[in-house]
From Swiss-Prot:
Keywords: DNA-binding, Homeobox, Nucleus, Transcription, Transcription regulation
Native source organism of the sequence: Mus musculus (Mouse)
Lineage: Eukaryota, Metazoa, Chordata, Craniata, Vertebrata
Function: Transcription factor that binds preferentially to a variant of the octamer motif (5'-ATGATAAT-3').
Official protein name in the record: POU domain, class 6, transcription factor 1
Residue stretches in coiled coil: none
Record-linked PROSITE patterns: HOMEOBOX_2, POU_1, POU_2, POU_3
GO molecular function per UniProt: DNA binding; DNA-binding transcription factor activity; sequence-specific DNA binding
A Pfam family it matches: Pou
TM region(s), chain numbering: none
Span list, region Disordered: 65-88
Length: 576
C-alpha cells in the first residue's frame, strides 16, 4: 500500500525500523488509520509521543526537520521502533541511546522516549504499539538474526502487506502508546476542537488477568492540539496473536515456502471496516517474506454500522492460542471465547463525548468471558471450567429396599406392585423361619428340590434383606408364603415331620442354634466375672443349675473369652 495515500480513509502501513541491541529484546511499531481532517490543521503540526518499552523504555531519536528533546538516557539492552509518518523515510542515523535497565524490569514512566515528527506529515490517527521479543526467539526464526552488541538496523519486507507486527513472547508490563495527530486536508474549515487524549494498548500475555493503564510522564508532556468534533473514535485492544502450531514450527525450523504459501492469501478474518477498507488482519513475516502468523482484528459491527458525526470504531484483536519459547515448545496457552463468533465478544459501548479515544481495560465479567493465561507443560492443556455435577444414572432396576427407603415413594410402583406389603412379608418371614428353627440354607434346599434352582439359599437371603427387584420379590412372595404355611403345619404335628418336610439326612442336619434367656445370660456373666476359666466340674454344675447342656455352657465360656480377646480386654488369663 502506498504510504502516502492519506486522502482516503484507509489503513496505511508506516515504514518500520527495528533496532536490535545485544541479547535482550526488540520493539515494533503499530499501524495508522488515515482520516480527513479540517484544513487549518495543516498549519498546526502535532507531535507524536512514543511510549517506552515494557522493560526499560529506552528512547529512540529520529532526525528530521523538527526534533524534540530526548528524555533521560536509559541504558537498556533493548531496541525501540517508532511509528513513522507515511512520507517520512527511515534516516540512516537512527540509533539507540544506551540507557541503564531498571533492576525490577518494570517500565519507568519518567524514562519514556520522546520523538517528534515534522508537521503536515501524518493524517488521521496513528497508534503506536510496542512489543518485545527475546533475542533467543528472534534467532530461532528464519531470516531474523540478532544484531551485534553495538546495535544494528534491519527492515522486514512490507511489499503487498497492509499491516505488520512481530510476535511478542515476553510482556511483563503493559506497553504504552501515543497516537500522533497531524493535519492533512487543506480544503475544510476548522471548527472548535477538544484535546485528543493519548491511548494505550494493553497486551494480555501476562500472568495478571487485567491491568488498568496508567498515564505516563510522556503522556502529560505531550502538546495538546486543537481537537476536531468529527474525529472518529477508535478503541484498539490488541489481545495478542493467533498462531497455528504448524506455522510456528515451520517458521522456527526454517520451513519451505510451499508450506506457508497457502497462508499468504487467506486472512484469518475477512470482515472489514466499511469506512476503512483493507483492515482485515495484520500479517507477520520474516526477512525472506514468509508468512509466520497473522493478527486479525475483530470489529464490532454494531457500532460501525451506526453513521454519526462521531463514529465509534471498536477494534479488538484475537487472543493467542499458543505461546512458544525459543525452542518451539509450548509454554503457555490462552483460553478465550471461540474465534468464529467475534462480534459477540464485546457489547457496543456508548461514547461519552463525540471525540474521545478511550482505553478500555479488559476485565473479567460474568457475561463476557475474558482470556486468561494458563502455564502448561509442552502439551497444551485446557482450562477447566466450572460445571454443575451431572447425576449418574444407572440402568439397573432399583431394589425394594431402595424404593421403600425413599420418603416420597408411593406404595405402588409402575407395575402395580405393593412395595410396603412385600417389605412387611419379608420381615415376618424371617421371624417365622427362625421360630421354626430353620436356616436360610434349609429353606433354600427345600424350595430348590420342589420349585427349582431359582429359589436357592441366596435368593432367600436377598429376599429377606430386600436386596431384590420388585418383580422378583413379587414372584418369590407367593411361593415362600405357601411353603412357610405348610412348614408351620408340619411343625405343629411334630419336629420330626418338619425335618422330613424340609428334607436332608439327619446326620447332615445342622445343629440347632442355642438361644439363652436373659436370666441365663445374666447368671453366666456373673460366673464369668468370678472365674473366666472354670474347670470341667464347675461347668457341669453351672449347666445343671441353669438347665442347659454342659457342652452349650462350655462353648459359651469359650466364646465369651474370645470376645474379650478380640476387644483387648482379656490379658491376664492363662489357658492351661
Amino acid at each position: 500500500m502506498d504510504p502516502g495515500a492519506g486522502s482516503d480513509s484507509s489503513l496505511t502501513v508506516n515504514e518500520q525500523v527495528i533496532v536490535m541491541s545485544g541479547h535482550e529484546t526488540i520493539r515494533v511499531l503499530e499501524v495508522g488509520v488515515d482520516a480527513q481532517l479540517p484544513a487549518e490543521e495543516e498549519s498546526k503540526g502535532l507531535e507524536s509521543v512514543a511510549a517506552g518499552g515494557s522493560q526499560s523504555g529506552g528512547p529512540v531519536e529520529a532526525s528530521g526537520p523538527a526534533e524534540a528533546g530526548s528524555c533521560d538516557p536509559d541504558h537498556s539492552a533493548e531496541a525501540t521502533v517508532a511509528a513513522r509518518s507515511p512520507s517520512e523515510s527511515c534516516p540512516s542515523d537512527c540509533h539507540l541511546q544506551p540507557s541503564p535497565e531498571p533492576a525490577s524490569g518494570i517500565t519507568d514512566p519518567d524514562a519514556a522516549g520522546c520523538t517528534s515528527c515534522p508537521p503536515g506529515q501524518v493524517a488521521g490517527q496513528q497508534g503506536l504499539a510496542v512489543w518485545t521479543i527475546p533475542t533467543a526467539t528472534v534467532a530461532a526464526l528464519p531470516g531474523l538474526t540478532a544484531a551485534s552488541p553495538t546495535g544494528g538496523t534491519f527492515k522486514p519486507p512490507l511489499a503487498g502487506l497492509q499491516a505488520a507486527a512481530v510476535l511478542n513472547t515476553a510482556l511483563p508490563t503493559p506497553v504504552q502508546a501515543a497516537p500522533p495527530i497531524q493535519a492533512s486536508s487543506p480544503a475544510q474549515p476548522r471548527p472548535p476542537a477538544q484535546p485528543q487524549p493519548l491511548f494505550q494498548t494493553q497486551p494480555l500475555l501476562q500472568t495478571t488477568p487485567a491491568i488498568l493503564p496508567q498515564p505516563t510522564a510522556a503522556t502529560v508532556a505531550a502538546p495538546t492540539p486543537k481537537t476536531v468534533d468529527a474525529t472518529p473514535q477508535i478503541t484498539v485492544q490488541p489481545a495478542g496473536f493467533a498462531f497455528s502450531p504448524g506455522i510456528i514450527s515451520a517458521a522456527s525450523l526454517g520451513g519451505q515456502t510451499q508450506i506457508l504459501g497457502s497462508l499468504t492469501t487467506a486472512p484469518v478474518i475477512t470482515n472489514t471496516i466499511p469506512s476503512m477498507p483493507g483492515i482485515s488482519s495484520q500479517i507477520l513475516t520474516n526477512a525472506q517474506g514468509q508468512v509466520i502468523g497473522a493478527l486479525p482484528w475483530v470489529v464490532n459491527s454494531a457500532s460501525v454500522a451506526t453513521p454519526a458525526p462521531a463514529q465509534s470504531l471498536q477494534v479488538q484483536a484475537v487472543t493467542p492460542q499458543l505461546l512458544l519459547n525459543a525452542q518451539g515448545q509450548v509454554i503457555a496457552t490462552l483460553a478465550s471465547s471461540p474465534l468464529p463468533q467475534p462480534v459477540a465478544v464485546r457489547k457496543p459501548n456508548t461514547p461519552e463525548s463525540p471525540a474521545k479515544s478511550e482505553v478500555q481495560p479488559i476485565q473479567p465479567t460474568q457475561a463476557v468471558p475474558q482470556p486468561a493465561v494458563i502455564l502448561t507443560s509442552p502439551t497444551p492443556a485446557l482450562k477447566p471450567s466450572a460445571a454443575t455435577p451431572i447425576p449418574i444414572t444407572c440402568s439397573e432396576t432399583p431394589t425394594v429396599s431402595q424404593l421403600v427407603s425413599k420418603p416420597h415413594t408411593p406404595s405402588l410402583d409402575e407395575d402395580g406392585i405393593n412395595l410396603e406389603e412385600i417389605r412387611e412379608f419379608a420381615k415376618n418371614f424371617k421371624i417365622r423361619r427362625l421360630s421354626l428353627g430353620l436356616t436360610q440354607t434349609q429353606v433354600g434346599q427345600a424350595l430348590t428340590a420342589t420349585e427349582g434352582p431359582a429359589y436357592s439359599q441366596s435368593a432367600i437371603c436377598r429376599f429377606e434383606k430386600l436386596d431384590i427387584t420388585p418383580k422378583s420379590a413379587q414372584k418369590l412372595k407367593p411361593v415362600l408364603e405357601k411353603w412357610l404355611m405348610e412348614a408351620e403345619l408340619r411343625n405343629q404335628e411334630g419336629q420330626q415331620n418338619l425335618m422330613e418336610f424340609v428334607g436332608g439326612e439327619p446326620s447332615k442336619k445342622r445343629k440347632r442354634r442355642t438361644s439363652f434367656t436373659p436370666q441365663a445370660i445374666e447368671a453366666l456373666n456373673a460366673y464369668f466375672e468370678k472365674n473366666p476359666l472354670p474347670t470341667g466340674q464347675e461347668i457341669t454344675e453351672i449347666a445343671k443349675e441353669l438347665n442347659y447342656d454342659r457342652e452349650v455352657v462350655r462353648v459359651w465360656f469359650c466364646n465369651r473369652r474370645q470376645t474379650l480377646k478380640n476387644t483387648s480386654k482379656l490379658n491376664v488369663f492363662q489357658i492351661p
